[in-house]
């Protein structure tokens, strides 16, 4: 729950900026949709490679809290830079740095959630966390909307709000989140189980030596990547990620079609995140009961439907609201569920690295998807680009469902 509060504050900070980024790049800076595609690609994938590094550092040190703290702190520092940045190169550099911070913190944070949760309820635990996380993601754009409504072109005000929330998030992590040691806890469970059954100590036991607990746990190994179930998860995550374009494109398409005022633009993020917040926990429980792999894959049908709504010729609030509901439901069915699914397939001593690897594959794929979709929009137009993305998802979902048909989680 405390980690949820940290994520709530951090998402207020990050999503307040994300909500105005499409307009800031295309309207305030006067750049093209291709340039926004590059920036959105950086948002999606700049921290991708360090997600594995963050997970690896978490597993090696057995200190996920402090590895996560580095990532949260790095993102907070970029909020200061936003107050002084001008032009695309500076904005892009800060976006990259912020995403690196997110990449460093995400896998250790999810490893902490998995370490503190009942293994049978991983989906629910991640769902509750994502609900709090998404509450912040809804409040951030709402604050951005209020700021832009009160002060037209008041982007600096949004950046100040973002900085304050980021500082509070780092403080909550450092002061309130327990310093869990997942590898040590897993070893202790095994050791005590053997003792309770009258069995000898496990091979290589060092618990009675000075500093013995710090030496516990199996040597780190990348062997989990050779397991068939893990490989299939990574393949599916990459394939579906390649067909997931940034939300900003969907929102720009809705605005382009309906022509509503720019001040209302951040509320599109609020709508999506409000639906995600309401559905994250119940969908997580549903995934625990009926299969996380099934929910992950078939959740992308909702994304295809959202693209179709944005491409449809029907104007007005109804199709916009339906598109936002579908997007929010898609994230509820996929975001935390991927981490829960990966956590259930690997041992505790490599859990952070495994989660980071899955998230890296997804992030790199989405980075390529956003950059490619920007070019496709420019070449083929908004409507055709969205219909192509819809058709590709309709084909890919059954293929991915077949690949994960025997998933143990």
List each language-model region with its residue ranges.
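Transmembrane alpha-helix termini and helix-breaking/packing motifs in multi-pass membrane transporters
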Residues: 23-28, 139-157, 368-384
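C-terminal transmembrane helical hairpin of 12-TM major facilitator-type secondary transporters
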Residues: 293-338
């Amino acid at each position: 729950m405390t980690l949820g509060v940290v994520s709530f504050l951090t998402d207020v900070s990050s999503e307040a900026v994300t909500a105005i980024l499409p307009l800031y790049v295309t309207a305030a800076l006067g750049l093209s949709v291709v340039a926004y595609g590059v920036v959105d690609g950086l948002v999606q994938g700049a921290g991708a490679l360090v997600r594995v590094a963050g997970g690896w550092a978490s597993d090696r040190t057995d200190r996920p809290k402090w590895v996560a703290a580095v990532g949260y702190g790095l993102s907070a520092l970029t909020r200061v830079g936003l107050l002084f940045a001008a032009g695309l190169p500076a904005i892009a550099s800060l976006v990259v740095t912020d995403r690196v911070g997110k990449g460093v913190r995400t896998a250790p944070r999810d490893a902490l959630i998995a370490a503190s949760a009942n293994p049978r309820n991983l989906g629910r635990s991640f769902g509750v966390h994502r609900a709090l996380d998404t509450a912040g993601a809804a409040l951030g754009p709402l604050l951005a909307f209020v700021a832009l409504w009160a002060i037209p072109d008041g982007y600096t005000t949004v950046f100040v709000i973002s900085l304050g929330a980021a500082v509070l998030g780092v403080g909550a992590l450092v002061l309130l989140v327990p310093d869990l040691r997942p590898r040590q806890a897993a070893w202790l469970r095994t050791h005590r189980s053997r003792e309770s059954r009258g069995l000898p100590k496990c091979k290589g036991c060092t618990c009675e030596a000075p500093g013995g607990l710090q030496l516990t746990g199996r040597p780190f190994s990348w062997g989990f990547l050779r397991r068939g179930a893990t490989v299939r998860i990574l393949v599916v995550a990459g394939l579906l990620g390649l067909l997931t374009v940034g939300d900003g494109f969907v929102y720009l398409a809705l605005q382009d079609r309906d022509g509503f005022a720019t001040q209302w633009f951040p509320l599109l993020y609020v709508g999506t995140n409000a639906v995600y917040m309401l559905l994250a926990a119940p969908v997580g429980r549903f995934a625990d009961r009926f299969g996380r792999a099934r929910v992950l894959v078939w959740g992308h049908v909702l994304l295809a439907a959202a693209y179709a709504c944005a491409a449809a010729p029907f104007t007005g609030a109804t199709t916009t609201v339906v598109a936002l509901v579908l997007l929010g439901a898609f994230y509820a069915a996929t975001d935390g569920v991927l981490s829960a699914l990966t956590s259930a397939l690997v041992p505790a001593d490599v859990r952070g690295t495994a989660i980071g690897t899955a998230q890296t594959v997804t992030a790199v794929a989405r980075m390529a998807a956003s950059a490619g979709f920007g070019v496709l929009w420019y070449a083929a137009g908004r409507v055709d680009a969205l219909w192509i993305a819809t058709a590709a998802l309709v084909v890919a979902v059954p293929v991915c469902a077949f690949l994960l048909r025997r998933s143990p989680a």
